[in-house]
C-alpha cells in the first residue's frame, strides 16, 4: 500500500484530499495542529500527525512516505504581509529543511499553489500568456515559495510538482460556499452588473484528481500544472443553480461602480479602525467584473487530466453537505 502525507489535512482542501486518496487505497497520514478542529476528518482512517509547520523540526515524519502533498497555507487575499510570509513561505522553508534533515526518500512532493501566480482578468491565461498581476501578499508569497522549491529541486533533486488550482469550491468549503448559500437562504444574493463575467472555478474533486495524477505520472518533476473545471461559467450561472436548489429567486443586481465605492469606504474605515473586518476590496471587485479563465491544455495532455464537468452533481454534493452541517448544528 502506498503512503501519502498531507499537510493541512483538517481543512477544506486537505480533508477532501484525504477522502480522495483513501478511496484510491492509499495509507493517508495527515498533519494537524493539536488545537485543530478535526470535524472534517471524522470517520476517516487518517493517521493523524500532530505538529506546527512553524516548528517543523518537532514533527515526527513517517519514514516510509511515498508522496507528500503540501496544502497547509494562509489562504486569503486580505491577509497581511507578515501572516503570508510566516504561514506560506517560512512554513514551507521550515518544512523542507526538516524533510531534508530527516532524509525522507519520497517519490514526489506536490505543492498546492494558486492559479493567481499567473494573473487574472484575461482569457486563456498561461505561463506564456499571463494575466493582470495579483499584487497582494498571498500571491506574492506563493510565487516566492514556488521559486524556493524550484531552487531546492535543482540543488537537492527534490521530486517537485506544483499544482495551481483556480478558485476551489465544494463540500466542506466554509469560506465561500457557505456565505453564498446563507445569502441565498436569507434572500439577498448580490450579483454585480448582471453576473455576466466568466470565472475560473475548480471543483475540489478535480483538484484532488490533479493531485493524484501529479503523484503517479512519470517524468514530470519540476513542472507546474493549472487546474480548473475547463468550463466557462459566469457568476450568474453559478448562482442560478443554488437559487434553483433552494427555491429562491435573484432579487438584487447592483451596478458595477457601487462595489468599488463600498470597497474604498471599507478601506478607509479599516485604516481608522483596524479591528473592522473588511469583506470587500478592489481586487475582489475586479475579479467579479472581469473575464478570467486559464489554458489547461498542458494539464490535460501531460497528466491525462479529465475534469468532472457535472455541475448539477457537484452543486448537489455541496447542498447535501451544507444542509447536513446545519442540521447537526455546525453552521449557525
PLM regions with names:
Residues 144, 173-179, 193-215, 222-223:
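Substrate-positioning beta->alpha
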Residues 37-42, 46-91:
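NAD(P)H-binding glycine-rich loop region in Rossmannoid oxidoreductase-like domains
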Residues 4-24:
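N-terminal Rossmann NAD(P)H-binding glycine-rich loop of SDR-like oxidoreductase domains
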Residues 294-302, 306-332:
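Amphipathic terminal alpha-helices
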Residues 213, 217-279, 316-319, 325-332:
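Mid/C-terminal beta-alpha module of Rossmann-like enzyme folds, strongest
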Residues 122-168, 189-192:
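Catalytic helix-loop patch of NAD(P)-dependent Rossmann-fold dehydrogenases
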Residues 94-137:
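Conserved Rossmann-fold NAD(P)-dependent oxidoreductase catalytic core, especially the SDR/UDP-sugar
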Residues 204, 240, 264-306:
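Conserved C-terminal active-site "lid" loop/helix of NAD(P)H-dependent oxidoreductases
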Amino acid at each position: 500500500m502506498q503512503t501519502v502525507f498531507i499537510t493541512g489535512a483538517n481543512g477544506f482542501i486537505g480533508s477532501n484530499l484525504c477522502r480522495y486518496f483513501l478511496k484510491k487505497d492509499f495509507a493517508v497520514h495527515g498533519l494537524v495542529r493539536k488545537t485543530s478542529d478535526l470535524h472534517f476528518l471524522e470517520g476517516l482512517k487518517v493517521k493523524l500527525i500532530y505538529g506546527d509547520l512553524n516548528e517543523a523540526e518537532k514533527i515526527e515524519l513517517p519514514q516510509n512516505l511515498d508522496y507528500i502533498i503540501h496544502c497547509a497555507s494562509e489562504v486569503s487575499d486580505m491577509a497581511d504581509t507578515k501572516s503570508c510570509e510566516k504561514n506560506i513561505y517560512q512554513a514551507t522553508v521550515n518544512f523542507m529543511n526538516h524533510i531534508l534533515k530527516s532524509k525522507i526518500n519520497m517519490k514526489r512532493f506536490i505543492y498546492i499553489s494558486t492559479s493567481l501566480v499567473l494573473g487574472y482578468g484575461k482569457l486563456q491565461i498561461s505561463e506564456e500568456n499571463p494575466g493582470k498581476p495579483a499584487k497582494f501578499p498571498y500571491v506574492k508569497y506563493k510565487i516566492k515559495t514556488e521559486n524556493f522549491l524550484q531552487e531546492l529541486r535543482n540543488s537537492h533533486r527534490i521530486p517537485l510538482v506544483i499544482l495551481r488550482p483556480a478558485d476551489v469550491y465544494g463540500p466542506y468549503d466554509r469560506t465561500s460556499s457557505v456565505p453564498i448559500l446563507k445569502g441565498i437562504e436569507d434572500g439577498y444574493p448580490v450579483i454585480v452588473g448582471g453576473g455576466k463575467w466568466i470565472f475560473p472555478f475548480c471543483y475540489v474533486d478535480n483538484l484532488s484528481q490533479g493531485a493524484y495524477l501529479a503523484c503517479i505520472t512519470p517524468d514530470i518533476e519540476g513542472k507546474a500544472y493549472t487546474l480548473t473545471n475547463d468550463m466557462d461559467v459566469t457568476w450568474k450561472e453559478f448562482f442560478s443553480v443554488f437559487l434553483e436548489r433552494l427555491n429562491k429567486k435573484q432579487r438584487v443586481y447592483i451596478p458595477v461602480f457601487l462595489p468599488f465605492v463600498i470597497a474604498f469606504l471599507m478601506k478607509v474605515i479599516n485604516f481608522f479602525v483596524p479591528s473592522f473586518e473588511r469583506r470587500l476590496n478592489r481586487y475582489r471587485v475586479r475579479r467579479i467584473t472581469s473575464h478570467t479563465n486559464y489554458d489547461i491544455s498542458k494539464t490535460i495532455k501531460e497528466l491525462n487530466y479529465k475534469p468532472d464537468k457535472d455541475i448539477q452533481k457537484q452543486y448537489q454534493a455541496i447542498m447535501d453537505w451544507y444542509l447536513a452541517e446545519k442540521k447537526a448544528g455546525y453552521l449557525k
